[in-house]
Each structure stands twice: as structure tokens, then as C-alpha cells.
Amino acid sequence: PGSQLVLFGETAHREVCKAALQKWITRKARMHLLPWLRSVSHELHLPFEDASIRRQKTRWGSCSATKTISLNCKLLFLPSHLVRYILIHELCHTIHLNHSRQFWSLVGSYEPDYRQLDDSLRDARLY
């Protein structure tokens, strides 16, 4: 209820429809995920430099050495508790650019159930 997507025009052309849908999803992701990332960043006092939305095949997100966070537009289709965990995970990479014990300790200080959430992400392709 509330939001709907209507495709019109040359809908017989599958690639045109696919491109329109991907553009719409990316725009929606930008509208919802980037403000959420800023909010969690502020809440946890973990600043980042820049953020973008991408269509990634194998990653939910990434963080560069310049503290630029990229989020996968497909996060829109995950339950909110998993998205929040991914936001925390990527924000912790602004401190530790690896998956060291220090990194996981930092993640755990913000999200004690991170192991269970990380396991849940293995099945996230089902969403």
C-alpha cells in the first residue's frame, strides 16, 4: 500500500524495462538508505566521508580507506534489522579496514548479536 511502480511505454523490450526498474530501485535506495546511514553514523559517533548506492553482485556494502561507504541497492529488500547490522558493519570499517579481532569487537560493542545476524545474511539472497 502507498507505493507502486508502473512501467509504461515499450514494455515489450525487456532490457528497457529492466533498466527502468533498476533506475527506480537505485533512486529509492538513495532516498531511504543514505539518510539511514547518516542517522546510524551520528548515533554511533562513527563518521564517514561519503556514501553511494551501487548495484553489487556479491557485496551488501563496502568501505574504502577514504571512508567512502558504498551500499548495495538490494538492501531495500532485506529486513530492517539486517540492514541496520550492515550499516553498523560498514561504519566500523571506518575505524578498522579489515576483519580483525579489533574490528569484530567494535561491531560487537554496537551490535551484540552480530554473529547471528551475519549468519542470517548467508540466506539473505532468499529475500
Region annotations inferred by a language model:
Residues 90:
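Walker B catalytic acidic pair
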